């Protein structure tokens, strides 16, 4: 797929697992697999919101501004069942939050004001026919 992260339930797999390949705020590429993620966010004065356009492979081509904390940590297990923890800044912080949300039934459109959400879904409807029916993972991903 063409995104920075993908949750298992986005491709019909009923497991609490996500994968990511995403740069952090310093443009350092970070990759990983997280099973049964537990997300931590800064609190109090340490909590700073970052407002940027966000998209989703479940809503291909549609983007809207979404406010999220600029730092996040996720812990869980890797693909071998070993404990793992990732600290995210910049886009990586957003990715860790976004993918964990998917696994707990929240899509990023749920995190934006109603007016923005309506525009997001309308934009997606206009673009949806341009994507294969098996999006976000297509047969070509396995060739």
Model regions and ranges:
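Positively charged
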Residues: 1-143
């Amino acid at each position: 797929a063409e995104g920075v992260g993908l949750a298992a339930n986005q491709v019909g797999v009923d497991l609490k697992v996500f994968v990511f390949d995403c740069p952090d705020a310093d443009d350092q590429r970070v990759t990983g697999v997280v099973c049964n993620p537990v997300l931590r966010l800064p609190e109090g004065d340490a909590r700073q919101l970052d407002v940027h356009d966000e998209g989703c492979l479940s809503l291909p081509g549609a983007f809207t501004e979404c406010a999220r904390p600029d730092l996040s940590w996720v812990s869980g297990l890797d693909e071998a069942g070993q404990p793992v923890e990732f600290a995210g800044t910049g886009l990586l912080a957003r990715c860790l939050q976004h993918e964990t949300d998917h696994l707990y039934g929240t899509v990023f459109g749920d995190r934006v004001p109603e007016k923005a959400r309506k525009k997001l879904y309308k934009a997606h409807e206009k673009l949806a026919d341009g994507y294969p029916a098996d999006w976000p993972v297509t047969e070509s991903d396995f060739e």
